[in-house]
C-alpha cells in the first residue's frame, strides 16, 4: 500500500499491517470508496496449508466443491494456489451437510440460479462461514476433465427454462 496525496493506492501485492492506526486509516479509506471489508478469520489447514472451499451451487443443488489450498492467507486458484479434492477433507458428515445447506441458502437468498460460494471452515471449530458469493459458479478444471458436472447441469437447467419448466 502506498499513499498518493490523501488516498491509498493498491500496489497489487499482499502486505501485512500490524499498526492499529495504519489499519484504521486504511479501513476508513476502503469504506469511503464503497468497498466491503471482511473480518479476518483463521482458516482450517489441510496437510499444513490454509484452505477454504468454493461450493458451486445450481438452484437447490451443490454441483461441485473444490478445496483451495495455500501456504499463505489467500487461496484463490488464479494466483497459482493448489486445488484439492473435497473427499480429501476429514469433515464430519454434519459439517458437510451444514456447509451445503448454508451455500444453497445463500444462493436462494440472493435470487441466483448459479453461484460460487466461498466457504471458510474456522480453525479448530468445524464451523463453516460463508465469506463471499460469486454470481457465477466457477471454471474448475477438476470437474471439467472428469464429469463436467457444473456446465452440463447449467445447460440442462437453461434447456428446462426454455422448454417451459420454470
Task: Report the location of each language-model feature.
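Phosphate-binding site of ATP-dependent enzymes
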Residues: 1-82
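Short, low-complexity Ser/Thr-rich regulatory SLiMs
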Residues: 57-59, 119-123
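C-terminal active-site "lid" helix and adjoining low-complexity regulatory extension at the edge
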Residues: 80-101, 105-114, 121-166
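Broad gene-expression machinery/nucleic-acid interaction feature
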Residues: 52-54, 116, 130
Amino acid at each position: 500500500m502506498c499513499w498518493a496525496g490523501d488516498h491509498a493506492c493498491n500496489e497489487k501485492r499482499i502486505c501485512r499491517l500490524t499498526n492499529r492506526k495504519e489499519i484504521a486509516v486504511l479501513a476508513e479509506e476502503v469504506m469511503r470508496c464503497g468497498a466491503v471489508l471482511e473480518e479476518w478469520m483463521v482458516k482450517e489447514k489441510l496437510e499444513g496449508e490454509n484452505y477454504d472451499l468454493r461450493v458451486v451451487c445450481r438452484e437447490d443443488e451443490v454441483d461441485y466443491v473444490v478445496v483451495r489450498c495455500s501456504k499463505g492467507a489467500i487461496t484463490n486458484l488464479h494466483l497459482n494456489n493448489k486445488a484439492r479434492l473435497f473427499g480429501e477433507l476429514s469433515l464430519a458428515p454434519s459439517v458437510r451437510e451444514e456447509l451445503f445447506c448454508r451455500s444453497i441458502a445463500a444462493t436462494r437468498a440472493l435470487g441466483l440460479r448459479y453461484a460460487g460460494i466461498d466457504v471458510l471452515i474456522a480453525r479448530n471449530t468445524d464451523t463453516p462461514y460463508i465469506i463471499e458469493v460469486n454470481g457465477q459458479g466457477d471454471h474448475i478444471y477438476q470437474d471439467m476433465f472428469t464429469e463436467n458436472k457444473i456446465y452440463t447441469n447449467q445447460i440442462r437447467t437453461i434447456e428446462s427454462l426454455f422448454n417451459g419448466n420454470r
